Amino acid sequence: MAMTAAAVTVPLGVLLRREVTSERMERPDVLCGEAARSRKGEDFTLLLAEAGERVAGDPSTSFSVFALFDGHNGSGAAMYAKKNLLNNLLRAIPSGLSRDEWLAVLPRALVAAFVKTDKDFQAVAETSGTTVTFVVIDEWVVTVASVGDSRCILESADGSLYHLSADHRFDSNQDEVQRVTACGSKVGKLNLVGGPEVGPLRCWPGGLCLSRSIGDMDVGECIIPVPHVKQVKLSNAGGRIIIASDGVWDDLTFEMALECSRGFPSDIAANRIVNEAIHPRGLRDDTTCIVVDILPPEKLAPSPPTKRQGKIVFNNMFRRKHTDVSFILDREYAEPDEVEEIFDDGSAMLSKRLAAGYALQSMFEPFSCAVCQVQLKAGQGISVHSNPLQHEKLQGWQGPFLCQSCNEKKDAIEGKRPPRDS
């Protein structure tokens, strides 16, 4: 009779410790480091280890925010987004939510905050624009919203690589090329008179090589501020997040950035990544990097590697050396280090993005604009749905609702109006 693989018997002590850990999972330590080399002065960062509290006055509900803004055609949009985006996010989240509810509405609130920030900045009538990569860390849950090409990656404690942001460069995203051309704009390289096409793919009018950003009011309305949002949950082994501008990613692959910084504390790691990026060809662009380590509580900071490289060194970042029997047993029968995907949506349809999670939010804020949060009288708002009569399950509310100006913004984002310069 053929023998099957025997099931692994896990000691009772290990099982009991797992049960206790799952019931009382401690908050991680969040450590961050930043490095930047400036050429144009258009990169800005936001580093807030304690950005706010889900429950006012309760420090145990604090969350962290780390963001990178890579401006272009001036620094105005990047500075404005840095100053206003977090406040717009907090206004879009109802009060009185449990932690699970807060995390559930966070992706929708991020979309609203990005769109409001863009709408308000364009009212200033300045033509600069900016990428945004905005990271919210609540205990072991990481939520990333991004427009542009300031990429964000995660390396888990076992060395697995996860992409937490999208790349909205036309050269890298055929779906965005199709979306923009369907809206009536053209995508192509710079065409020199009498010569070949040169450079990256760009959107015309405007010549921007990104399909999503905040600002950029001088280009067609097909360049939108609706972010890609991804939410994941780390295991209690932790992980390392790297956020960097294209000054880094134009010269380093994700693996190269991880390799040159692995095993070092976050501040040293960020410096090593920036130096590695500018070493081959010198400083050609603003080059900025943020490194965030999410560590099991009370774990020692990593030491620089000597001869050892690779995943073993990275794993040492998250574990102290132990000699007691219980630790040896825990390591021998350790559960797999997994990163759980909770949410992932990069749709450009603002109505779809705002409707996600609305049933929960409508319990708290049924009559406010889903973008700017202005209070609406009953029957005053405009439903995001193209045909509200098809949505009887919303029991007459037919929400979410928008004010008149935000509804015009939605129509522009969804290509229901021609580009400004057409």
Swiss-Prot record:
PROSITE patterns per the UniProt record, alphabetical: PPM_2
Protein name: Probable protein phosphatase 2C 69
UniProt entry tagged with the keyword Magnesium: yes
Biological processes annotated in GO: regulation of intracellular signal transduction
Binding site residues for Mn(2+) 2: 70, 246, 285
EC number: 3.1.3.16
Cofactor note: Binds 2 magnesium or manganese ions per subunit.
Amino-acid positions noted as binding Mn(2+) 1 in the UniProt annotation, renumbered to this chain: 70-71
One Gene Ontology term of the molecular function aspect: protein serine/threonine phosphatase activity
Names of required cofactors: Mg(2+); Mn(2+)
Keywords linked to the UniProt accession: Hydrolase, Magnesium, Manganese, Metal-binding, Protein phosphatase
InterPro entries from the UniProt entry: PP2C (IPR015655), PPM-type-like_dom_sf (IPR036457), PPM-type_phosphatase-like_dom (IPR001932)
Superkingdom classification of source: Eukaryota
Keyword Magnesium part of the UniProt annotation: yes
Signal peptide per UniProt: none
